[in-house]
């Protein structure tokens, strides 16, 4: 799995080098829908939260992100606030306040 993550981060970095600015849009249903069900379209075999956070950190380190959003969280469909809490963790990474 680490090799896959490293290869994806490498491709992300190559792509980022071609851009001046980035609008980062994170759809919560990119997470594994078997665990994170608080979305209208849960997807099986999505990212795990730590994996997605590593990708976001990598993108944020580029300094090219000028706007970002996080979409598709539906608390009424969530179980034990797992999806809502995942969204909070993602926003902390985007904002750079990991201890908030």
Regions found by a protein language model. Name each.
Residues 1-100:
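Catalytic cores of soluble, metal-dependent hydrolases
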């Amino acid at each position: 799995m680490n090799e896959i993550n490293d290869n994806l981060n490498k491709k992300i970095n190559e792509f980022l080098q071609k851009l001046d600015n980035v609008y980062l849009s994170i759809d919560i249903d990119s997470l594994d829908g078997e665990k994170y069900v608080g979305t209208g379209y849960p997807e099986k075999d999505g990212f795990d939260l730590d994996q997605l956070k590593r990708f976001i950190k990598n993108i944020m380190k580029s300094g090219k992100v000028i706007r970002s959003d996080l979409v598709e969280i539906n608390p009424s469909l969530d179980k034990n606030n797992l999806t809502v809490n995942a969204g909070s963790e993602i926003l902390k990474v985007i904002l750079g306040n990991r201890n908030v």
